[in-house]
Design a protein with these regions (language model features):
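Conserved catalytic-core motifs of eukaryotic protein kinase domains, centered on the activation segment
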Residues: 68-70, 138, 154-155
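Flexible, glycine/small-residue-enriched loop-and-beta-strand segment within the central core
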Residues: 3-8, 15-19, 23-120, 147
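Short, charge-rich, low-complexity interaction segments located
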Residues: 147-156, 161
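Conserved catalytic segment of ABC-fold P-loop ATPases
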Residues: 123-126, 139-141
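Short, intrinsically disordered, charge-balanced linker/junction segments flanking boundaries
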Residues: 1, 167-174
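Conserved G/P- and acidic residue-centered "switch" motifs that form tight phosphate/ATP-binding loops
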Residues: 128, 146
Length: 174
């Protein structure tokens, strides 16, 4: 009897919560992440300690959040930290640096290959262009792109942005 082999399916670990009306595509590693309704994470993405709102589109090959290394120590190697590490060796047991929460608002579009540093907040309605490296918070309804990512323009005029923020359509019932 042949067994069905699932190749490259997503790995969803830790305290992750994926809304029943959300999708995570194959090859993605989702760690301690909350994914809101009608949002999707594309193929081969990585998230760690991330909160993602509703109606978000995250393209393939994105990296959002993740662990930090303590650069003020003699070594940045995890063998000098407490807890499990990929090297399975310990020379010291300093506490691990906290992983700050990365927040992606509602109705955010993140292009392919984007990397977002831990602890960043991306406001609702924002767009991040393909291949961007995000090291600063992005306000609502702004378009950013580049390495490092920089402001390109607002998506709408001030009145439209205010209207969309007030309606909070992402909280409406289906």
């Amino acid at each position: 009897k042949a067994e069905k082999i699932l190749l490259n399916r997503p790995a969803i670990t830790g305290s992750s919560v994926i809304h029943q009306k959300a999708k995570v595509c194959s090859g993605s590693q989702i760690n301690d992440t909350v994914l809101g309704r009608y949002s999707y994470i594309g193929h081969d993405c990585f998230t760690c300690q991330v909160q993602i709102g509703a109606f978000c589109s995250i393209a393939d090959n994105c990296r959002i959040g993740g662990h930090k290394h303590a650069m003020e120590r003699v070594s940045t190697s995890p063998v000098f930290e407490a807890g499990k590490n990929c090297l399975k060796t310990h020379f010291a047991s300093h506490p691990r640096p906290q992983v700050p929460l990365t927040v992606i608002g509602n109705d955010v579009w993140i292009g392919a290959g984007v990397q977002i540093q831990s602890g960043i907040t991306v406001g609702s309605g924002a767009v991040i262009g393909m291949g961007s490296i995000v090291t600063h918070n992005i306000p609502p309804y702004e378009i950013w792109a580049g390495n490092p990512a920089h402001f390109i323009r607002k998506r709408f005029d001030y009145e439209t942005i205010l209207f969309l923020q007030e309606t909070q359509f992402w909280d409406w019932d289906d």
